[in-house]
A protein has these predicted regions:
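Compositionally biased alpha-helical segments
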Residues: 1-129, 153-164, 189-198, 202-209, ...
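Short, solvent-exposed, Trp/other aromatic-anchored flexible loops in extracytoplasmic proteins
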Residues: 121-190
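Short, solvent-exposed mixed-charge patches
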Residues: 221-224
Length: 224
């Protein structure tokens, strides 16, 4: 419940219902609806409305891979480091101004070489603001390093390669506004579980945790 005030000083106590056709609807304590044109709202109330209603947004991700620069003296044979940089863009679709803050999240997934399990290699978050300068397009970058190497005298290839991404945008209350992924196996009902993972954890296609993969070398040693 809020006390609204128009530019003429008229005060109305009520709960915000919606914005429609250039006005807002407020529900009074007795249940009646009252309409107030946006241009008649006080500056404080207009700012409140512009932070209350999250806009329609879309999110897109462009992932680029590059070989990590390393000191040649410390490079082992068959030891590859790849940096994946994800450029995330959040674009406001709705025309109504929005002065609040959204949160964007991006998760970079790898696929383990030995078992095929998935692992969270990197993640990043950013506070999303739409301004006159960015014209409703907010971008940020997140990077993660993937390592693939041979172990035990080249008997086994270990590490993880880049598999894909998940991007999510939420409103100030934590409600999801939009999500985007290039992982065909990642179902909507499993996304929240993945968002709770920490970097380095292993999991399967249903986003259930798995134990750290152990080298097959130990099984092979028993046969000798």
């Amino acid at each position: 419940m809020r006390v609204w005030e128009d530019v003429n000083g008229l005060q109305i106590k009520g709960k915000f219902v919606r914005e429609i056709f250039g006005s807002i609807e407020v529900q009074r304590p007795n249940g009646d609806l009252h309409s107030i044109p946006l241009e008649d709202l006080s500056p404080e109330d207009l700012t409140y409305v512009r932070t209350l209603i999250p806009p329609d947004v879309v999110v897109s991700v462009r992932a680029k891979e590059s070989v990590k620069d390393r000191n040649e003296e410390f490079i082992w044979a068959n030891d590859k480091l790849t940096v994946v940089t994800a450029e995330v863009e959040v674009r406001k679709k709705s025309r109504s101004p929005y002065q609040g803050t959204l949160k964007a999240e991006v998760y970079l997934i790898g696929k383990e070489m030995v078992t095929g399990a998935y692992t969270l290699v990197g993640k990043g978050t950013s506070r999303v603001h739409f301004t006159e300068e960015n014209k409703g397009r907010y971008t940020f970058n997140t990077s993660a390093t993937y390592r693939v190497y041979e172990e035990y005298n080249n008997l086994e290839t270990r590490g993880a390669e880049y598999e894909g991404y998940l991007a999510v945008v939420v409103d100030p209350q934590g409600n999801k506004l939009v999500q985007e992924s290039d992982l065909s196996w990642l179902l909507d009902e499993n996304i929240d579980a993945l968002r709770q993972f920490y970097v380095g954890i292993f999991f399967d296609e249903t986003c259930k945790k798995r134990s750290v993969p152990r080298p097959r070398y130990y099984d092979g040693r028993e046969r000798f």
